[in-house]
């Protein structure tokens, strides 16, 4: 029996993937391969042939460094094993402590040598993670029960930092672009994700340990093995180049090709050394049963976008039927990752901030493009990647006019994404936009650029900006029978052929009873093309399926054909989607702002911009004497009235240690109430800036508003130092 799907008014060519000008020529050259390209980037048949230039110099360097570090690593491991054995044997605590001291000494020796051998931009992730954990920016979920890989809890500082990032995101995008907003359900019925393609295509390849059942994502397993393999000095350069080529082709490989690699290299479980099962496909969505009967299958949403798409008609109506418009949503999404790793970068539950910009497929210009036209960006095009070239810096206008970026709307959002990331503190030298190759493209995208941040884990995708064409709305039109279209007046009326189903309402009523109305509405909504196809199917097969209901010829005995004049055309809009991974941006921001004081390597801090810093200012009385209390209270109350989160630190520690504590958690400004504040009639205080540690002296009544302006970005610290005298020392000390 043929299944009949509702299909109407799909824009022709809407699913063709965009090709920049540099890929429209017939041939592309790489170091060892001259290949033909077809317009369809998503073709696995052709994509698997591509070769990329691979620079292995960093691999050679790492291998040489590791050779020098190997004896030190062995010494540390030897000491650690000895301590574990001593504890197992119940050795005296004092003896164990002595061994621990020796272990610390060896670890310090290894750490110093590592810093010496690696380039000067070496990042001390261990120190940053120590600060994150001590100050509870975030930690493993359910840690007291051993924790769960791929799940994290945000602490007070982490929550505030994320909230501030999202607040700026709302200002930067939702308010400035006058976007609509929705908040949709996390529990998603299966038909929705079946229509979107997630049920069939949202999967990774997985293998298991044959004895323990431990699961591994196959491409990650192969990559880890290969990277370790080519780090071996005994491996010839020719073999290293061949392995590097295979690493770059992993994303193109089929499940069978990956299975062949496992067998050829006799890969084992990295945890136990046991054999591995054959690969299987694993859908990354969390399945659920909705309701007590368990009959309604569903999933936890893998993205927030689908909630916006299924509400398109209501949003269009709210926007008075006009295009273009954009809708935003912030919320959690869920992906059942096979082997979560790299901290917050690959997790099973994460916050997304997504925008769906709906526009006409034949007009993707943007009215505000001129406002970002001169924005310079580092763009790593698909062409450059395939030719082994470096990313290029250019304006977004050059990229759009040169055909590198598909259209103005896509380019506009890319520029706005960069502005937002730089505003919250992402290092511009560690930010680039990389264009997806065809094999990387999501099943719904026709062009996509990722904003990537360089971290100690490498280049990490933090924001995706995709032209999803008309895919989603077309799919939901088929799946639901509801026309996800917009009407656009024609310049001139035109005559079209019309085909309308004429159902037998009595027969349908007897068969479907309470669902009869739903069936009749579905038949009434058929496009002429869909109705024609249905008539043909009923003639050939005798039955068809509409929206899950099986219909026979007796239920739809006839179809009416006529010509009619139309004054509007129905168009399924295209969608441009910026999608922000908040957790990844959060982690990249912490790495990019992590600092170690030059004069004291033990003093670490986060140089977070004031606009996103969890706490904006600290109030530090130099003494606990009662005469200080009114000034501290005055400052705290005024700062609170100005919506400035603050921390009062009146502990007995030295002022230097208190500065260090507030620096650690990223507080950008500190107000010190000293003896001059109390004793002088002017009642001045000092204001300290975290990064430079510079201090100025100013009247106590003026400092709260100055901090408000500093936090809002309306005032820069340089302007403050130019207006107020630099603080050197107190005039009074008691």
Predicted ranges, named:
Residues 2-4, 18, 29, 37, ...:
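NTP/phosphate- and nucleic-acid-binding module
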Residues 9-10, 453:
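Long, mixed-charge low-complexity alpha-helical/coiled-coil segments
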């Amino acid at each position: 029996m043929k299944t009949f799907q509702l299909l109407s008014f799909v824009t022709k060519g809407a699913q063709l993937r965009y090709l920049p000008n540099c890929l429209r020529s017939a041939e592309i050259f790489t170091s060892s391969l001259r290949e033909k390209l077809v317009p369809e980037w998503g073709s696995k048949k052709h994509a698997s042939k591509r070769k990329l230039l691979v620079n292995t110099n960093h691999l050679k360097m790492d291998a040489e460094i590791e050779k020098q570090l190997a004896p030190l690593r062995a010494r540390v491991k030897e000491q650690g094993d000895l301590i574990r054995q001593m504890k197992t044997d119940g050795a005296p605590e004092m003896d164990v402590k002595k061994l621990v001291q020796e272990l610390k000494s060896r670890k310090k020796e290894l750490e110093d040598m590592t810093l010496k051998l690696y380039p000067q931009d070496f990042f001390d992730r261990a120190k940053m993670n120590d600060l994150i954990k001590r100050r509870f920016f975030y930690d493993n979920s359910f840690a007291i029960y051993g924790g769960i890989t791929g799940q994290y809890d945000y602490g007070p500082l982490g929550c505030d930092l994320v909230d501030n990032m999202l607040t700026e995101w709302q200002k930067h995008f939702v308010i400035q672009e006058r976007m609509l907003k929705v908040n949709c359900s996390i529990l998603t019925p299966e038909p929705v994700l079946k229509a979107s393609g997630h049920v069939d295509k949202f999967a990774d390849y997985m293998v298991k340990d044959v004895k323990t059942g431990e699961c591994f994502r196959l491409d990650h397993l192969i990559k880890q093995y290969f990277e370790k393999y080519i780090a071996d000095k005994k491996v010839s350069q020719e073999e290293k180049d061949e392995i590097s080529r295979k690493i770059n082709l992993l994303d193109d490989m089929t499940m069978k090709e990956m299975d062949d690699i496992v067998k050829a290299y006799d890969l084992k479980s990295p945890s136990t050394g046991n054999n591995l099962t054959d690969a299987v496909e694993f859908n990354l969505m969390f399945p659920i049963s909705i309701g007590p009967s368990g009959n309604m299958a569903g999933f936890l949403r893998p993205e927030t976008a689908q909630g916006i798409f299924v509400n398109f008609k209501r949003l269009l109506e709210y926007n008075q039927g006009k295009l273009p418009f954009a809708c935003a949503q912030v919320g959690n999404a869920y992906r059942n990752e096979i082997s979560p790793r790299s901290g917050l970068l690959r997790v099973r539950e994460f916050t997304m901030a997504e925008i769906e910009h709906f526009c006409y497929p034949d007009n993707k210009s943007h009215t505000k493009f001129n406002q970002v036209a001169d924005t310079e960006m580092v763009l790593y095009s698909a062409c450059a990647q395939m030719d082994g070239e470096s990313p290029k810096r250019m304006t977004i206008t050059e990229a759009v006019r040169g055909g590198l970026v598909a259209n103005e709307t896509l380019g506009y959002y890319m520029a706005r994404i960069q502005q937002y990331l730089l505003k919250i503190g992402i290092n511009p030298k560690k930010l680039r936009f990389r264009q997806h190759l065809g094999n990387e493209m999501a099943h719904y995208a026709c062009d996509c650029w990722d904003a990537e941040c360089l971290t100690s884990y490498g280049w990490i995708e933090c924001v995706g900006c995709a032209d999803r064409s008309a895919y989603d709305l077309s799919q939901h039109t088929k799946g639901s029978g509801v026309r996800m279209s917009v009407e656009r007046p024609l310049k001139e009326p035109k005559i079209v052929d019309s085909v309308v189903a004429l159902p037998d309402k009595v027969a349908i009523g007897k068969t479907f009873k309470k669902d009869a109305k739903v069936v009749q509405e579905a038949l009434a909504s058929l496009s002429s093309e869909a109705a024609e196809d249905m008539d043909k199917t009923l003639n050939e097969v005798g039955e068809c399926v509409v929206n899950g209901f099986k219909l026979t010829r007796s239920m739809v005995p006839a179809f009416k054909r006529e010509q009619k004049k139309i004054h509007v055309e129905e168009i399924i809009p295209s969608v441009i989607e910026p999608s922000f991974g908040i957790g990844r941006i959060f982690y990249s921001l912490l790495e990019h702002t992590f600092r170690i004081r030059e004069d004291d390597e033990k003093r670490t801090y986060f140089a977070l911009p004031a606009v996103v810093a969890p706490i904006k200012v600290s109030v530090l009385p130099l003494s606990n004497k009662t005469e200080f209390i009114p000034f501290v209270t005055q400052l705290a109350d005024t700062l609170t009235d100005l919506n400035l989160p603050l921390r009062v630190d009146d502990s007995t520690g030295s002022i230097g240690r208190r500065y260090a504590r507030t620096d650690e958690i990223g507080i950008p400004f500190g107000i010190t109430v000293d003896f001059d504040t109390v004793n002088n009639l002017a009642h001045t205080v000092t204001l300290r800036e975290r990064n430079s540690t510079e201090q100025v002296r100013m009247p106590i009544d003026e400092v709260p508003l100055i901090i408000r302006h500093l936090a809002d970005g309306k005032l820069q610290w340089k302007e403050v130092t130019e207006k107020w005298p630099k603080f050197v020392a107190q005039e009074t000390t008691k």
